[in-house]
Amino acid sequence: MKAERSDVDRAHAIYTKGNLALYDWWVLGLSNQWIWSCPTEKLLDLYRAHITANHLEVGAGTGYFPAKTMPSAQPRIALLDINRNCLEKAAKRLAAFRPEVHQENVLEPLIIRGERFDSIAVNYVLHCLPGRLDQKAAAVFDHLAPHLQDDGVIFGSTLLGLDIQRPL
């Protein structure tokens, strides 16, 4: 899937340094519980069940979830985001783990050197990308698959609009 550059830029423009300063409080503290009816603790459980010590975090956000759930004191953690503000915020939070930082567009083929990952999180990413859910999900997973170990796991969550039929 090839998204127009302006569409991609608009999709992540909200993640300014100022907005990221409030993100954990607003999204993880209030919105998850009261607007989306999915308490942050449920997402932490998802991470605890699937994150490994060889992990790629797609859509770095603030680094909250890997910071709270990393199963190793010396992991290999990589952050991938198109937004420099998110990468800086998450890398600062995860500095003790010395994260790899990749500023790339997940809707395009990715260049990530080194061994493949045992876990890849795509959390709160798909709804931020431009385009139809089926097309952007296919593109994202096609671009991540070459970077996942054969027995690895991709996990995450997204927000669905009212017009999306939910399988669960």
What do these predicted ranges mean?
Residues 1-50, 153-168:
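Conserved class I S-adenosyl-L-methionine
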Residues 54-109:
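Class I SAM-dependent methyltransferase SAM/SAH-binding core
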Residues 123-127:
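Residues lining the SAM
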